[in-house]
Regions:
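Alpha/beta-hydrolase superfamily serine-hydrolase fold, recognizing
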Residues: 1-217
Length: 217
């Protein structure tokens, strides 16, 4: 927050299996409505709200934004999605790209089963890769950060391509050598990832974006 000069709200949202979909999703929508209504009281501005999420959180804010578009609600200024799950259908072990991590596959599969006990994985609010071009039209600017050694890398880049084809100003960066969750764990690639996020926030504030790490692709 200090480095970006921004006000940060870190949401401790309720999770599955105690609260499966759509509980957390609807909780997020209600929370954002509250923040918009009380932005000045919190020290921010309702006209400059940026949503950021990592992994499941990135999936959540993407689905929320699709809902804003469908309902004609005020859109966030932009999104920052870090290694987002974009396709919850199929077997995780069959996903291409990254390093096959048995432990992550097991944990992710369990998480999906808890979040969606009754199925519905092809719902675009859950698997944004299935959103149509019409559903994506008008999507706000978005930065998608992926990790090279992550089974979610390919689907996130495919979703970025779908956004671009729908006319979205999208920036997609893959951090070489990084694994899923590298930002909070502060493992390889976290400095590059943090620099990209700070640079993108400045872009959303003044329209000037530069890639601080040319080696990142």
């Amino acid at each position: 927050a200090y480095r970006s000069g921004s006000l940060y709200l870190d949401v401790d949202y309720k999770t599955a299996p105690e609260h499966p979909f759509p509980y957390t999703f609807e909780e997020g929508l209600d929370l954002l409505s509250y923040v918009e209504s009380h932005a000045e009281d919190l020290g921010g501005s309702k006209d400059n709200l940026v949503l950021m999420g990592q992994s499941a959180g990135a999936n959540l804010i993407t689905g929320m934004t699709l809902t804003f578009l469908e309902e004609g609600r005020k859109l966030p200024t932009g999104l920052i999605c870090c290694y987002p799950p974009c396709d919850l259908t199929g077997k995780l072990a069959d996903k291409k790209g990254g390093i096959k991590d048995p432990r992550m596959i097991e944990v992710a599969s369990f998480g999906i089963a808890c979040y969606l006990p009754h199925g519905g994985t092809e719902n675009p609010l859950i698997s944004p890769l299935f959103a149509s071009k019409d559903q994506l039209k008008g999507f706000p600017p978005v930065l998608i950060i992926t990790a090279e050694h992550d089974i979610l890398c390919d689907e996130a880049l495919t979703f970025a391509r779908h956004l671009a084809e729908a006319g979205t100003a999208v920036t997609a960066k893959t951090i070489l050598g990084a694994r899923h969750g590298f930002l909070p764990r502060r493992t390889e690639g976290h400095e590059e990832g943090e620099a990209l996020i700070l640079s993108y926030l400045r872009f959303l504030q003044n329209g000037q974006y530069t890639n601080p790490f040319p080696s990142v692709c």
